[in-house]
């Protein structure tokens, strides 16, 4: 039976090796954490840094699951028309002023990189941390070395600032303290969604992304062991 791992390309495998190497160099050294990050990245970008894919061929019901209240005021015909225009769609779902951007900048700062960093404020923060102006040059987030360092910085900073009760809910005290992949996947998924997302919402997994990551994490553990 063919598995997800049987279908990984040479480029994907090379990128995984590079990401693991950089995690070790930058301080994420627990293979249980590393495998969870890889599992989440696998469903976000498949290890090829890229801009967020079009939703024009996505069922409206799934769009509603993903974007919730941001699209609830559109009826079916309106949502179908909206998703047919990528720029208009991303401006509608991401053009939120509270993230430091104007209503017509949602498309410009849509998801990019390995973990689909989104919103102008997140681009600025990620760029400032590595000394590159990602606000001016957002497509640079799709370059593997930049995407990898932004990915690692994102999770390291996220776990450093995580509320202690959030980490305790996943039986952890810091990013390298996980003892089970169930906890590490849950925490990494929660961090990627934002710690403001309740654990109950993470566990309910309306989009199926967490289940996908959980189904792959053990395979990534084995890959990491083989790289050692």
What are the roles of these predicted feature ranges?
Residues 20-31:
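Helix-loop segments that flank and shape redox-cofactor active sites
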Residues 31-46:
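Active-site-adjacent structural elements in enzyme catalytic domains
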Residues 123-142, 160-173, 179, 198-201:
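Substrate-binding clefts and substrate-entry loops adjacent to catalytic sites
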Residues 2-18, 42-157:
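Peptidoglycan-targeting cell-wall enzymes and recognition modules
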Residues 41-45, 119, 165-205:
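Acidic helix/loop microenvironments that form the catalytic cleft of cell-wall polysaccharide enzymes
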């Amino acid at each position: 039976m063919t598995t997800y791992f049987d279908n990984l390309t040479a480029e994907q495998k090379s990128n995984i090796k590079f990401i693991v190497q950089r995690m070790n160099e930058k301080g994420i050294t627990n293979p249980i954490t590393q495998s969870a990050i890889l599992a989440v990245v696998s469903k976000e970008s498949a290890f090829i840094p890229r801009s967020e894919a079009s939703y024009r061929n996505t069922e409206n019901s799934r769009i509603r699951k993903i974007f919730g209240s941001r699209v609830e005021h559109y009826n079916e015909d309106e949502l179908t028309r909206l998703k047919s225009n990528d720029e208009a769609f991303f401006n509608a779902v991401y053009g939120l002023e509270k993230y430091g951007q104007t209503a017509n900048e949602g498309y410009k700062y849509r998801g990019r990189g390995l973990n689909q960093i989104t919103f102008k404020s997140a681009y600025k923060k990620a760029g400032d941390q590595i000394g590159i102006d990602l606000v001016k040059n957002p497509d640079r987030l799709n370059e593997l070395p930049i995407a990898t360092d932004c990915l690692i910085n994102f999770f390291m900073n996220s776990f450093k600032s995580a509320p202690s009760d959030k980490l305790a809910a996943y039986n952890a005290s810091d990013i390298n303290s996980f003892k089970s992949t169930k906890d590490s996947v849950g925490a990494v998924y929660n961090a990627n969604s934002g710690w403001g997302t309740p654990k109950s919402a993470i566990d309910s997994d309306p989009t199926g992304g967490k289940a996908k990551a959980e189904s792959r994490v053990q395979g990534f553990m084995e890959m990491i062991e083989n790289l050692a």
